[in-house]
Amino acid sequence: GATVKVTNATFKSDVLESDKPVLVHFEGPWCGPCKMVAPVLDEIANEYEGKVKVAKVNTDENPQLASQYGVRSIPTRLMFKGGEVAANMVGAAPKTRLAAFLDASL
């Protein structure tokens, strides 16, 4: 139930070709709110194990992924299902809101 670090090189296999829905969290090392959300994402990854995969993208290291999916501010979460973006959520959010977002998009 751990979160997966995804890069430009692994995005296709880890996210687009995943047999499960993938929640992709776009973050950056300089982003305060991203650091606050990180432990919540780890909890979500454990609680939703088997139902959803949780992946993190460092936008500083993978700017092309951010621009490809129109991520302009971080943190942003995109829910991928079958290689397509099914839903998105911008900004820091408490665990209850993240869980509600997941439940609605699964």
UniProtKB/Swiss-Prot annotation:
InterPro entries: Thioredoxin, Thioredoxin-like_sf, Thioredoxin_CS, Thioredoxin_domain
Disulphide-bridged cysteine pairs: 31-34
Keyword Electron transport: yes
Domain of life: Bacteria
CDD domains recorded: TRX_family (cd02947)
An MF annotation (GO) of this entry: protein-disulfide reductase activity
Domain Thioredoxin positions: 1-106
Alphabetic keyword roster: Disulfide bond, Electron transport, Redox-active center, Transport
GO CC annotation terms, alphabetical: cytoplasm
Keyword hit for Membrane: no
Family as reported in the entry's similarity comment: Belongs to the thioredoxin family.
Primary role: Participates in various redox reactions through the reversible oxidation of its active center dithiol to a disulfide and catalyzes dithiol-disulfide exchange reactions.
Name this protein carries in UniProt: Thioredoxin
